[in-house]
Amino acid sequence: MLTAARLGAAALSAALLTGLAAGPALADSPAPTPAAVPDGLYGKSDPTYDGVWRQSLALTALTAAKVTPADSAVGWLTGQQCEDGGWPSYRAAGAACDPKTEDSNATAVAVQALVALGGHQEAVDKGVGWLKANQNADGSWAYNPGSPGDADSTGLAVNALFAAKTDPAGVAKAGRSAFDGLALFQLGCAAPADQRGAFAYQTDPAGGALTPNALASAQAALAASGGHLPVAGTVHADAAPKALACADAPAAQGSSASSAPVSHAESGEAVGAYLAAQLAAGGDHLTLTTPGAAPTPDYTATAWAALALSQSGHPQQAAGAVDWLGKEGATWSKGGTDAGATATLLLVAQAAHRDTAALTGQLTALGPAPKATDASATATATAPAKKKDGGIGQYWLIGVGLLIGVGGGLLLSLQRKRNTHL
């Protein structure tokens, strides 16, 4: 799933996150030979860049929908893990692991999927171990180890730690925790008021101001709110997300207080307030802006914003985005044939406690037949809804019609006889 939004910052990191066509940044690179879709994998498109990503999202979403995936689907994901614990985006059957192809995004979502499935503790522990080993010295994570960290990858890694019940505050390099790494990318009180709480994709090596990024903000927000996939969405707050509290007097500008990192305690609410404002201003969706191209709806960022707001207990602020995705999401999912997009839409619907039957049915159809399915999860997706009378409603109506007809005939006959005797 390639996008120009992230290719400019870290070649393939965005490829797993947006579901859009490849951007011009790869125009000079020879196109790889499309990989054959292996048995057990959800979706029919080339898995080279998103195989582990879409499989992990599909397994997570279906498990939350009480669908027990086929052994081949689970086995494909576990078989992609390398001996050191990391996952690549995709590894052809029989191919050796290459540490240079392992990435934090694939590893993070695979860990969350296996936690959701249950029964894969050894693989989860190895995945968490890989994340710990490949954390940057500033506490962040890069898409590929050895590169500068970014907010999306750091947020996904923190999601995986939460899923594995590993406190991110205790996962550190050189004294910098995962929360410290996440804070590197969040705009604080030194930023303009309408940008506070947002996340930048990466920091400026020259020390310049952080630039808000829609996808980075949306994905980092789930981590800042203490969440992971799947989002339960059971906590409800009465108030809107609390914006970052800043002293805006002129004397405070440029002070150490205004330039201080956003604390972890305030981080989730601050980015939630930013996302809620952006959604309200953008017609209930976030926007992808790429240099040289017209702005377009950012389906991925909108979905992750809805997940984050649901996680932080603000379903009212997420509702508009959930509704928008319900109306427009088929464009993103290509009518339910894109496994990664369909799985993400299902995760959003689950977090918002919306009807999930159709999406569950679509996603189930994109992979191997499941071992077991909760009938209530897919009933409306596979057959017309039955009446509350247990399915005999049409026969009851026919019977009533016949009785009325017979009764009417008798009355007419009696009336004729009565007229004859008068």
Task: Give the role of each language-model region.
Residues 2-422:
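Preference for long, amphipathic alpha-helical scaffolds in soluble/luminal domains
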